[in-house]
Every structure is written in C-alpha cells, then in structure tokens.
From Swiss-Prot:
UniProt entry keywords in alphabetical sequence: Blood coagulation, Cell membrane, Disulfide bond, G-protein coupled receptor, Glycoprotein, Hemostasis, Membrane, Receptor, Signal, Transducer, Transmembrane, Transmembrane helix
Protein name, as recorded: Proteinase-activated receptor 3
Function: Receptor for activated thrombin coupled to G proteins that stimulate phosphoinositide hydrolysis.
Residue ranges listed under propeptide: 22-37
Sequence similarity: Belongs to the G-protein coupled receptor 1 family.
One CC-aspect GO term: plasma membrane
Stretch forming the signal peptide: 1-21
Organism the protein comes from: Rattus norvegicus
Gene3D superfamilies registered for this protein in UniProt: Rhodopsin 7-helix transmembrane proteins
Residues annotated as transmembrane: 94-114, 124-144, 167-187, 209-229, 258-278, 301-321, 339-359
Cytoplasmic side: 115-123, 188-208, 279-300, 360-368
Length: 368
C-alpha cells in the first residue's frame, strides 16, 4: 500500500503543471531589485540576486562571477554600500579637506626644499636623495587639485581617462618612491656610520645617483599596469563617473589584481620597512648617547618611523588584507578603510621637507 502511494506521488510531481514553475520564476525575478556587485565588478559579469537572500549578510560586498563580455565596458552598476560611500560626507568633505591641507603645505614646503638644495654645496649624497624626494612629492602635489575637485564634486570625475590615470599613477608612484628613497637614505647612513671604511671606498656621488636611478626605474615599471588599465567608469546609479574607485574585473582579472597589489605592498613597503628599521636602529645603537649628533639622529629616526607608521603602513597592510579578502572570500568590505588609509598616505609630502631640515642640521654638525 505504501509503495503504491509513493508511486502515485512521484507520477504527480513528474507531470506538475509548468504554470507553477513559471510563477515561481516570476516571483524570484520580482524580488531581485538590489544587485550585489562590488568596487570590482560590472553589470554584465555578475548574476543578480536579492541581498536579503544572503544568509548573515552584514553589508560587505559579495560578488558572483559569470562570463565576461567580449566588448569593452564603460558603464557599471554598483550596490547600495558602494553608493553610500560615494555619497558620504567622508568621501565628499573629509578626504578632500585632507588633500587641501597636503596641497597648501606640501607645495610651498617642497619648493623651498628644492631652492635650499640648489644652493647647497655640502654633502652631495644628502642633496641627491632629498632632491629626488622633493621632486616626487611636488609631482604628486600638483595632481592633488584634480583629486580635490573630484571629491568635492560628489566623486564625479570630469577630467577624462588620461588625467585619471595620471593622478592614480602619481598617487601610488609618490608613495613607493618615497618609501624606497627613505630606505636608500637609511642604507647610506648605515654604511657611513657602521662601516665607514667600506663607505669611503665607494664613489659616493655615482653610488647615490645609481640608487636613485634604480628607485625611479622600479617605480615606473610597477606603475605601468595602473597607467595601462582603464581607471574611469560611469555608474548608472548615482549617475557619476568615478576615477579608480570602481574597477571592472573583466578589464583587470582578480588573480592579476591580487598578485600585483600584494607584490607591490611586499616589495614596495614590507621589505624596505624592515631594511629601514634595521639600518636606523643599528645606527642609533652605534652612536654614543653623548655624541652631539645623537639627539638629532633620534629626531630624524622618529620622524621617519612616523612617516612609515602613519603614511605607509596602514595603506599597505590594508591593501594586502583587502585584496586577499576579495580574492579568497569574494568580499571587499575593507575598501572604504583602504581609501581612507590612502588619503592619510598623502601626508608624507608634507613631512618629507621637515626630514630634510633635520638631516641637513646633522650633516652641518658633522662638517663644521
């Protein structure tokens, strides 16, 4: 008897009217008003599904990859979390206020630094290092008005694709150029103080020029992907054009983004940071506390550590976590924090000139 009942139920399910299935499909379609996409997605490469159907959804952006279209994408759809950031006072008021401060202080400070360096005859190594550092900072600062206008305009970029790529390259290029030059300065001071006999045998001017040349070549090569890949996208909602805030994963695939940015943070920050800490701490231990230049070296080292800790460390640590989180877990909830950290990273353009004045005092004491 039970067997007959099961057979009848199975036959009934097999010949279930298609109208029931069609009504169910229509119900699902009607509920998919919000699409879960990310800073790294486009409307053609993601399936749409209601955010309310995600169990335990907390606002982190989740994406479902599908086949990428063959044609180039210039218009994207983003979720409510992304639009919330793009419209927030943090993005349209606080971040541009910090950039204005950096521009107002950084431009004159670096111009004065270059003017002072042009008339300096002592310590050619100091002149070469800080000239390169001031040039990198100044190149970055002159692109800040475009970023300021972008954020004050509600994150609506009006300067075109080329200028968007230029400002993006200037942003990252300045940060990693500053990190590497500060590291080279630490190596130079380490050799001069800890290994003076070896240092005296080196062709100081050519050696310093070589170090700075290698830094610029490395930075230019690492910035090529940012200069080549598309950075500007128009958002259907809220009807703005973003610059570097939204990416298309079909234009820049996830594996490439992950390995590129992680290697950038690893070779551009983590290794130089370890080398800098080693060089400067060894330098402090080598010097006698009674030495007249010891206190100034302490000030210089503290300022360098402040620059690394406030300007460079948060950006690169969050950069690694963000891309690892997005690559392995398919979420990008840390992207807001990363953009804030990137904004704080611009403060190094204001602090570098003060480092020059401290280091110049040390050199003047040594040669007096």
């Amino acid at each position: 008897m039970e067997m007959k009942v099961l057979i009848l139920v199975g036959v009934r399910l097999l010949f279930l009217p298609t109208t029931v299935c069609q009504s169910g499909m229509k119900h699902v379609s009607d509920n998919s008003a919000l699409t879960a996409e990310s800073f790294n997605g486009n409307e053609h490469s993601f399936e749409e599904f209601p955010l309310s159907d995600i169990e335990g959804w907390t606002g982190a952006t989740t994406t479902i990859k599908a086949k990428c279209p063959e044609e180039s994408i210039t218009t994207l759809h983003v979720n409510n979390a992304t639009m919330g950031y793009l419209r927030s006072s943090l993005s349209t008021k606080v971040i541009p206020a910090i950039y204005i401060l950096v521009f107002v202080i950084g431009v004159p400070a670096n111009i004065v630094t270059l003017w002072k360096l042009s008339s300096r005859t002592k310590s050619i190594c100091l002149v070469i290092f800080h000239t390169n550092l001031a040039i990198a900072d100044l190149l970055f600062c002159v692109t800040l008005p475009f970023k300021i206008a972008y954020h004050l305009n509600g994150n609506d970029w009006v300067f075109g694709e080329v200028m968007c790529r230029v400002t993006t390259v200037a942003f990252y290029g300045n940060m990693y150029c500053a990190i590497l030059i500060l590291t080279c300065m630490g190596i130079n001071r380490y050799l001069a103080t800890v290994h003076p006999f070896t240092y005296r045998k080196l062709p100081k001017r050519n050696f310093t020029l070589l170090m700075c040349g290698v830094v610029w070549v490395m930075v230019v090569l690492y910035m090529l992907p940012l200069a080549i890949l598309k950075q500007e996208y128009h958002l259907v909602q809220p009807g703005i054009t973003t610059c570097h805030d939204v990416h298309d994963t079909c234009e820049s695939p996830l594996p490439f983004q992950f390995y590129y940015f992680v290697s950038l943070a690893f070779f551009g920050f983590l290794i130089p940071f370890v080398v800098s800490v080693f060089c400067y701490t060894t330098l402090i231990h080598k010097l006698n506390a009674q030495d007249r230049k010891w206190l100034r070296y302490i000030k210089a080292v503290l300022l360098i550590l402040v620059i690394f800790t406030i300007c460079f460390a948060p950006t690169n640590i969050i950069l690694i976590i963000h891309h690892a989180n997005y690559y392995y877990s398919n979420t990008d909830s840390l992207y807001f924090m990363y953009l804030i950290a990137l904004c704080l990273g611009s403060l190094n353009s204001c602090l570098d000139p003060f480092l020059y004045f401290i280091m110049s005092k040390i050199v003047d004491q040594l040669t007096s």
